[in-house]
Amino acid sequence: MERNKKIVFFLALALLWTTAITVACLVDMSDVPAANVENIDKLAHLGFYAIFSILWFLYLENKIESTPKLFLIVFMLSVIFGVFIEFCQSTFTANRQADVNDAIANTIGATIGLLLMAIYTKKFKK
C-alpha cells in the first residue's frame, strides 16, 4: 500500500476504534444481556486495548523514527486514554463507575498489543 494511503488508513482505523471504545464504555449497558462468564468484562478490556495499542502503533510508526520512543508513546497513550475513560465513566455517566481493575486490564491489554507489535517488528521489519 502506498505510504500516504497506509498512514491515512491506520489513522482512520485507530480513530474509529478509539470512538468505539469511548461509546462502548460510556453508554448505558444495563439493557444489554450479561454473559455468564466470570470477569468477561476484564477480557473485553484486554482485547479493546490490545487492538487500540496495535492500531495506534501502526499509525504512529510512520511518524516516530525511534522504536523505543514509539513503544513508550503508544503505551502512555493507551494508559492515559484508559484512565481518562474510567474518569469519564465516574464523572459523566449515571449508570457506569470507574474501576481500578478495568484500568489495570486496559494496561495489560495495551502491553499485550505492544508485545505483539514487538514480535511483528522484529520478525517482519528487519
Residues of each region from the PLM?
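Bulky hydrophobic segments
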Residues: M1-R96, V100, T107, T111-K126
